């Protein structure tokens, strides 16, 4: 195939060969893939781990739930969620304990008073 054949849009097989102007820009098909940069934030990971541990320990003891308030202003949503859940569960637990204590105080005093009246 010669330059004249190309200019005349003919090749050896008689098929049309398109001509392109030199000023035409064609898209580049090179691989421009950039891997996603993952920055591990150790501080946030520690906050989440600490928050989860305190949340789980709160079921055994009440104190870890109130200690978990340290993560309530965390930028990490998961740490903040566990912290809020811990504070809510701590409040509910204290309310239930107070109700039971008041109930038992009334129960004991009423039993004590009824026992006195029986004498």
From Swiss-Prot:
Which topology term describes how it sits in the membrane?
Answer: Multi-pass membrane protein
Instruction: Spell out the coiled coil positions from the record.
Output: none
Tell me which UniProt keywords the record has, alphabetically. Membrane, Transmembrane, Transmembrane helix
The answer to keyword Transmembrane helix applying to this record is: yes
- Source superkingdom: Eukaryota
Write down what this protein is called.
Answer: Uncharacterized transmembrane protein DDB_G0281147
Instruction: List the transmembrane segments.
Output: 52-72, 88-108
């Amino acid at each position: 195939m010669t330059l004249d054949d190309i200019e005349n849009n003919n090749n050896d097989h008689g098929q049309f060969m398109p001509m392109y102007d030199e000023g035409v820009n064609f898209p580049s098909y090179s691989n421009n893939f950039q891997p996603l940069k993952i920055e591990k934030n150790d501080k946030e990971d520690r906050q989440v781990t600490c928050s989860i541990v305190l949340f789980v320990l709160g079921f055994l003891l009440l104190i870890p739930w109130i200690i978990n308030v340290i993560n309530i202003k965390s930028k990490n949503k998961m740490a903040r969620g566990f912290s809020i859940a811990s504070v809510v569960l701590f409040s509910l637990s204290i309310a239930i304990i107070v109700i039971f204590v008041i109930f038992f105080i009334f129960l004991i005093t009423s039993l004590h008073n009824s026992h006195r009246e029986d004498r």
